[in-house]
Structure formats: C-alpha cells, structure tokens
From Swiss-Prot:
Protein's name according to its UniProt entry: DegV domain-containing protein XCC3382
A Pfam family it matches: DegV
Keyword presence, Kinase: no
Entry keywords, A to Z: Lipid-binding
Organism: Xanthomonas campestris pv. campestris (strain ATCC 33913 / DSM 3586 / NCPPB 528 / LMG 568 / P 25)
Function statement: May bind long-chain fatty acids, such as palmitate, and may play a role in lipid transport or fatty acid metabolism.
PROSITE patterns cross-referenced by the UniProt entry: DEGV
Phylogenetic placement of the source organism: Bacteria, Pseudomonadati, Pseudomonadota, Gammaproteobacteria, Lysobacterales
GO molecular function: lipid binding
DegV domain residues: 3-307
Positions with a binding annotation for hexadecanoate: 63, 96
C-alpha cells in the first residue's frame, strides 16, 4: 500500500523534512499589490518576499488557496498514479477554504481516477481522506509529522486515519504576535473577529502581547503578557513543562516569522532545545509560511504540540 501525505503550504515544517519524506504541498498564493508568490515552502523565497513586501503592506495581502480544479488536476495527473491512498491534511476549515475545496475535489477525483490508474498499470482502487487538522501553521505540523512516522512504521490506512483524527483533537498551537497594530489591521482587512479582544493601541503602548491559542478549530487569546521576548521565554518554559508531563507524540513544532537566527537568540529557546533532547522529543523549526506571516505579522512566534486538555499558564 503506497500512502501519500498532502499538506497545504500554511503547514510549518522544515523544507528538508518535506522533501525527504515526499510530502506534497498544496501551495497558497499570496498577492500584495502587484507582487504574487505561490508559497511552496521555500524558505529563501519566503524571506525575500517578507523583506520586500510583507513588512510594509502585508496586512493588505490577499491569499488564494488551491482551487477545487487545481486540487483535482494535481491528483488525477500525479497522485492517483503515485499512491494507492492519500491523506490530505488541511489548515482548520474555520480559517480557510482549503478543506472545503479538497473535500469537493475528492468527489471528482474518486469519480474520474480509474482510467488514469489503469493506463499506468494499476488495477487496484484508489482512496483519499481529507482531514481537518483543526489547527494552523505550526499546529498543522504535528499531524503531518505523525502521518510520516506511522507510514514509515508500515501501519495500515485505518489505524493511521484514527490516530490522525484523534491527534487533531488534541493539538495545541500557541502563538505570540510581535506587532498588534499589524494584527488589528490584518483582522480588519479579513473581517476577522477572533483577535477583537485585544485593544491594539493600548497593548502596543504598554508592550502587552497576547498569547493566542489554536485548539479544535478555534483561535482565541488565552493570556496577555508584557514584552515580546519575556513572553516568548514564558511560552518556551510552558512548553518545557508540558514536555516533562508527557506529550501525546514526541514532537514539538516551532514556526518563526523571520530568520531562524532570530528564533535561536530568543530567551528560553536553548532550554527548550535541551529539554527536547533530554526527553527524546523531535523539535521541528521552520520559517513561518507566507500565509502565516501575512496573517499574524513579521516576527511572530508559534509553538505547537499534542497533549491532554490543559490551560495555558505563564
């Protein structure tokens, strides 16, 4: 059984992990003014687009997910030949059209795949499952890493699916934006009310940073802390505590809206790296996707893991 794993480009995982494990990426296109980039998780392209466009006018960006027809074409031209079963793991359907587009495309794919597969010499049926990760950005990485692990262990489709759906329900994505003015401007552009609890002007004047939590599809502020670096340090320390209590998978994903050297310099990050090593947990760090950066702003930090239900505490 050849199992394929598909994510969208909002999923924050390192480029080399994606390539090494043949994870297929559905690109999300980002347009700022006349500049357009289809995000294929290329960190250099993301950083150069960030420096050229996102920092100044990112809040005006329009993001366009892969359409129903584009998803259908990708599957019928390639994936129904290369794989027997595909898991398509998407960003929370409350944040994007991708889940709905992929679900709609799946009907056409399952209708039309037989002649394509037969021409390639495959007589067995093809199947796919679209799974809402119920999370975003670094949070999407948790289920994707586990899908790669379970596939490598040779597990069957049914236990993989059950495990991924269970994990999605237990994934926590924590995020600290650096610039509340940007976040408010972006929320206005999108008509998004999930960050409406933050008084942006007040927050920026006092250097208050919200800790946002994505969990079971909902994104909401769960704490207000003072200063970006102290807030990052508290989030890393909280993650270390959860690590020691025991996570549901040996995975922590970190996304940063800029150069990774800046992430490495944040207080508390070295302690998180050391704790991961001691506890046998893999730490995946990546430059945040372009989609992530235009939505939460340059220099934002996201940390995700799967754990039993809990509350955030600094």
């Amino acid at each position: 059984m050849r199992i394929g794993i598909v994510v969208d480009s909002a999923c924050d995982l390192p480029q080399d992990f994606i390539q090494r494990n043949n994870v297929i990426v559905l690109p999300i296109s980002v347009r700022i003014g006349e500049a357009v980039l289809a995000d294929h998780r290329d960190e250099e392209a993301t950083l150069s687009f960030l420096h050229a466009h996102v920092a100044e006018r990112g809040h005006e960006a329009e993001t366009t997910p892969f359409s129903v027809n584009q998803i259908r074409d990708l599957f019928l031209q390639r994936l129904v030949i290369d794989y027997d079963h595909v898991f398509c793991l998407t960003i929370s359907k409350l944040r994007s059209q991708i889940f709905d587009n992929a679900t709609q495309a799946s009907f056409a794919i399952l209708n039309d795949y037989k002649p394509v597969r037969q021409a390639a010499g495959h007589t067995s049926p093809f199947a796919l499952r679209v799974i809402d990760t119920l999370n975003l950005f670094a949070g999407q990485g948790i289920t994707a890493v586990e899908a790669v692990r379970l596939r490598a262990q040779g597990l069957g489709v049914a236990p993989i699916r059950a495990r991924l759906e269970q994990l999605a329900e237990h994934t926590y994505g924590y995020m600290i934006p650096r610039d509340l003015y940007y976040l408010r401007a972006r929320a206005r552009t999108k008509g998004d009310r999930s960050v409406g609890l933050i008084g942006a002007a007040l927050g920026s004047a006092l250097d208050i940073k919200p800790v946002l939590r994505a969990y079971r599809g909902v994104t909401e502020p769960v704490a207000k802390l003072k200063g970006f670096e102290p807030s990052a340090e508290k989030l890393f320390a909280f993650t270390v505590r959860k690590l020691r209590e025991g996570l549901m998978t040996p995975t922590v994903c970190v996304g940063y809206g800029g150069e990774l050297a800046e992430l490495h310099a944040l207080p508390g990050y070295a302690a998180l790296q050391a704790a991961c090593q001691t506890q046998g947990v893999e730490l995946f760090e990546s430059v945040m996707s372009l989609t992530g950066m235009v939505n939460v702003g340059k220099g934002a930090l996201a940390v995700a893991f799967a754990a039993e239900p809990h509350s955030f505490s600094a």
